[in-house]
Amino acid sequence: MKVSYECGPCFLRQAREALDLSTDDDELKMDVMEEIFKFLSDNFKLGANSNSTGSAMHNLVKQKTGCIDPYRKEKIEGNEIALKYLPDVKKIIDEDDSLENYVKIAIIGNILDFGAFTLDDDIERVIKSSLKKDLTIKDIDEFENSLKTNDKVLYLVDNTGEIVFDKLLLAKIKEYGLDITIAVKSEPILNDACMVDALDAGLDEFGEIVEIGCGTVGYVDSQISDEFREIFNNHKFIISKGMGNYEGLTEIDLSNKEVYFLLCAKCGTISRDIGVNLHDMLLFKK
């Protein structure tokens, strides 16, 4: 996906956030922010790839501050809080164990910022109210048909915290008898899930966890490893979580694949690209 004018303020917000998490040295923050402005001045242009631009910016922060995983604390806390609520979520979904509700739970995980919740927050209320919302795009019948007609699936996860709720959908997928391969980032980027995060959340219970070979914002086809490219090419059925993976996968030819995107349209650029409203929950085939 290409950048829009709205991506500019978002990049700067992310840069400030990453800097605040990386260092307390205000002088260093200023120096790095100056370099980020120079980088964006040279690279933030019409036709630029959004994921590649964001990845390079975050790597600049890591390189200059020496902090390779600025979001580590937030990632650990996100998983811990989500795991704490998982039994309650299971009870909620037991009231209606339709495939659509499992999909909704996985998308709700994408909506919730687990790092912003405490153990006293009424997350159960948030989940129940979200489950009552309809999916704006709901290719659920095609999705179930793919579950029934394929023998394996590649599942591209997104953030920590969110991956805990993915466990429920992964368990549901296992009921269809599919072999599941779960793809995570090889290096830290934002609060995206890496191998250690996926193992901490228990995703290895559902299938083999593989690394994509890079630490990019979302999916960047030019940077994945040869090993992961072979895995990707050998899977016809792919489930993609979150906006970053949508931005990257829509840059490549998917005509010979069954790719389903599960996400909440939290960004104006992406909501317009898909043709939905901001904050809509979506399951759609591309």
Predicted features, each with a name:
Residues D151-K152, L178-I182, E258:
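Residues at the starts of beta-strands that form the adenosine-phosphate
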Residues I111-S130, L135-T136, S186-M195, A201-F206, ...:
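Conserved catalytic alpha/beta core of Sir2/sirtuin-type deacylases, generalized to analogous enzyme cores
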Residues K167-L168, M195, T250-D253:
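Short amphipathic alpha-helical segments
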Residues V184-S186, L190, L199-K286:
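C-terminal functional extensions of proteins
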Residues K152-L154, K236-F237:
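Structural motif
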